[in-house]
Amino acid sequence: MTNLRKTHPLMKIVNHSFIDLPAPSNISAWWNFGSLLGICLMIQILTGLFLAMHYTSDTLTAFSSVAHICRDVNYGWLIRNLHANGASMFFMCLFLHVGRGIYYGSYLYKETWNIGVILLLTVMATAFVGYVLPWGQMSFWGATVITNLLSAIPYIGMTLAEWIWGGFSVDKATLTRFFAFHFILPFIITALVIVHLLFLHETGSNNPSGINPDADKIPFHPYYTIKDALGFMFLLLVLLSLALFSPDSLGDPDNFSPANPLSTPPHIKPEWYFLFAYAILRSIPNKLGGVLALLASILILLIIPFLHTANQRSMMFRPISQTLFWILTANLMTLTWIGGQPVEQPFIIIGQLASILYFMLILILMPLAGLFENYMLKPKW
């Protein structure tokens, strides 16, 4: 009798995706982040669901309801800390996952890559609306500053901003709709993840060498299920350590004060995972220019497949491209640092230089490095 997992209509899908899936034999720990992101998403949906049972999306009670969750609900403090720090783990895994894709040339699977970029944007939108919900000072002013950027759009900008606000400023209507968005978006993300996997399984996984791995494939289970399990344990160890020992280290102290439209915090800044984009936004003195640069900093990922000039897919054997990649990584860390600093010298000029370098590396230097490496590989006799 044929095994049930190979014949049952539902189990067959699971079997082809997670059990009998042919996987390259040489994929490293950098390929763990897809499954880690899946775990992060599940943790966020579960903890978020339990938080939503006790949260009230009203300007008068939102802040108090979060305090109530932490003080009075059974393990509410733990659920909230897991949810808040789970977002940080989510973005850490996301950035490493995207970085892996750039380093090893995974972006040449264009459909998978494009769905991935859409996923990144959706997760960023979810995190942004979620940060507004506790209705602390930074929640309110972060929402005010970022939604206000819509008003930079010519002609329709202000109408658009007021439409998003549901009034003439960030208020009760804004909070209620942001809660609705924050609840629905993770399920949209889940649907997109399935599409992302669908396109990935059309081509199969890339591997560190960047060459066709079809000659040497191994079944996903038990090899990569065990390998992923190690990743899960490490992720949960880090998340629990954060949530239990230092739950507020990645948050902003201003968010412990209830939202007050009459008092502006000294430095308005988003959570750490948005600081690089915030630094690029602030580096341009013009409002519309800043908004366009902010969008370009993320949407530039969509054109990376078309900027691939090298004959080799992966950077594994391309030392010049490798050097530029690590300069890009250091540059993003610099931007993250600058995004959290006040708008004064020398931070302004450092932010502007780092922003210019960010776009130069992706648009000019890395494609040129690929061409130069092609030239160096040609026989010279």
From Swiss-Prot:
Residues that coordinate or bind heme b b566: 97, 196
Classification via Pfam families: Cytochrom_B_C (PF00032), Cytochrome_B (PF00033)
Mode of membrane association: Multi-pass membrane protein
Lineage, top ranks: Eukaryota, Metazoa, Chordata, Craniata, Vertebrata
Originating organism: Sminthopsis macroura
Organism domain of life: Eukaryota
Miscellaneous comment: Heme 1 (or BL or b562) is low-potential and absorbs at about 562 nm, and heme 2 (or BH or b566) is high-potential and absorbs at about 566 nm.
GO molecular function, one term: metal ion binding
InterPro entries named in the record: Cyt_b/b6_C (IPR005798), Cyt_b/b6_C_sf (IPR036150), Cyt_b/b6_N (IPR005797), Cytb/b6-like_sf (IPR027387), Cytochrome_b (IPR030689), Cytochrome_b_C_euk/bac (IPR048260), Cytochrome_b_N_euk/bac (IPR048259), Di-haem_cyt_TM (IPR016174)
Cofactors that this protein relies on: heme b
Coiled-coil residues: none
Transmembrane segments: 33-53, 77-98, 113-133, 178-198, 226-246, 288-308, 320-340, 347-367
Keywords: Electron transport, Heme, Iron, Membrane, Metal-binding, Mitochondrion, Mitochondrion inner membrane, Respiratory chain, Transmembrane, Transmembrane helix, Transport, Ubiquinone
Cofactor notes: Binds 2 heme b groups non-covalently.
Function: Component of the ubiquinol-cytochrome c reductase complex (complex III or cytochrome b-c1 complex) that is part of the mitochondrial respiratory chain. The b-c1 complex mediates electron transfer from ubiquinol to cytochrome c. Contributes to the generation of a proton gradient across the mitochondrial membrane that is then used for ATP synthesis.
Gene Ontology biological process: mitochondrial electron transport, ubiquinol to cytochrome c
Subunit structure: The cytochrome bc1 complex contains 11 subunits: 3 respiratory subunits (MT-CYB, CYC1 and UQCRFS1), 2 core proteins (UQCRC1 and UQCRC2) and 6 low-molecular weight proteins (UQCRH/QCR6, UQCRB/QCR7, UQCRQ/QCR8, UQCR10/QCR9, UQCR11/QCR10 and a cleavage product of UQCRFS1). This cytochrome bc1 complex then forms a dimer.
Subcellular compartments: Mitochondrion inner membrane
GO CC entries: mitochondrial inner membrane; respiratory chain complex III
Protein name per UniProt: Cytochrome b
Matches recorded under Gene3D superfamilies: Cytochrome Bc1 Complex, Chain C
Family: Belongs to the cytochrome b family.
UniProt binding sites for a ubiquinone: 201
Binding, heme b b562: 83, 182
